[in-house]
């Protein structure tokens, strides 16, 4: 294998971003097309789904069967489009870049915008009048009282009302069944026909058990839809081939027709069959569920047997492998989420965040890096696009420094991708959560940064979002919030003047954390039970270990592991705020600044007006997370332990537990832009820090900041975290690559779980905000995924600009100097 890796790496050196047009004209043309198309709303799925459910409304057919029929009918009847010269058949929607409508989730949120969504300033999504009328008169009225949020409202109106306040908690099940990694390897080995036959046999075997029989019947129906869809692709490609005059396009259509005639119906035999089968499965999962964070998984492991067989036989050249793999990258990027104007403030600029995982160790704990790993890293280098979200697992003792350096070189070249994940910490964390070591070693990254064993853990890792700043506000205001009136929301836990010791304040904060968790968990479980009743998932279930053995849908607990994720917003800001409270209000020997908690809260609530000296002290002298200050080290660890103790042992609706995480997408910027001041010295309406990243513009060495994060107990962050680091631009020279890789390895050996990078300076980002026309495709790392800078909301752009910047060579902090300073 080592000789083959060397051979492949040498061949890959021929390909660079600068010679893409010359060496790989197909990928260059696909990149240009991808960059030129506008996001367009696609209503086809919503029409088919709604029509079928209307027709079967009073049929007495179980919902598991009705929904399987509806999805199967859509897959069987949907139109087949070829928008470009991509080597793969199948597409998420009928548009070159489509935003599918999921009316059973939050699709109705665009109802007020049907006439304006095409022309809005922030990330317009094209919707023609005919389609808008169909949504307005035919689709949306049916779902007005049937969407999952409205079904939940019928059961728990009070907690659903709080959900809509946005700042108490957010339950993402209102929007999606997602954030998990199917085992597409099952399809590559068995074929859809194999799964269908298994369903038929088990349906007959369990004909005396209605629940199991219905489940297997739903799988059978859904699998037939997958077969029909791939057959339709084959037929349409054959028609196109017969009428095509361009010889290259004709050959491509003929190849697609041949491939899709065989897969995914039958087991894959070669690389292009395996890649196209996997992609069609992804499309079909999106047809059943929403297009958010459904992850292809460990592609260099799943596809490797097919790649190496073809490569060694001479049937597959490196150029072929790059073109096929690059075609998959563009297919994965063929869709975006449907986002209403109001949500642009929180989620603007995000893609569908399908994560691809490379490298790490295999199920035996040995080095899993192979020739295909390097091919896919090269594709990532050549194609700087938002999706897929590529991630590199790294095991400091099993993987080679050569692999580590190649990942580092890729990041320095494309300036954002991939992220690094620490196999030692992450595997042990999953084992600590009850997964077997073999299963834990086979983890893939989910969505932004979350972890889960491939096809074994239906992790629903974005289930709950907890805004920690709201919990802090309640602890400082006797249980009140800014949106629920003068009375305590859950419980009155004391006014600031009641806290004569720090521990009394801490107890109030801990109690508000527990009460928020209790209510968020209750609502999440209600959503989950409604998913079980109204939104069964036979396609996704068939591509997991567990459901076919148990005769139980994935959302009914069919998977081997059944966790839910709870991520936290504003951890660094809240940590700094609690440090400031302890320092200023409860540290007797602090001679620089002392005041009562009541006085501090009053100053904060007034946004520090008339308290400039206090504001300056809190910003510049109070203990800060990320500086190794003993108070900050203690408070950061106590916060981690508190959330873990509150959530980890709580049971979800599938019998699993809640895994704590710290990643924020763009929520930290959106929420921060509408939130009041904090005791940390942060003024009102300033973005929060991202993920678990220390607050920006703290003058400290990079290694100091990294060590503060690495010292946190990752066993108690089983949902993972996002750490964002910004380096001054540096060329991918041998010296810089080595330095980059060694810093990552040192951080991991100290216990760091994950880290991702932006290789940008303040000036470039400021210019990109001021002159967006000059930077139309500037790719940046947000908090767990990448985005095009120009598509982000203003708050998120500002947060990226002000993120602390470090010099790679020295590790020195580079302060932000604004004009006039």
Segments (PLM) and residue ranges:
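Extended, non-transmembrane alpha-helical coiled-coils
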Residues: 228, 232-235, 239, 255
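Short, Lys/Glu-rich amphipathic helical modules
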Residues: 237-253
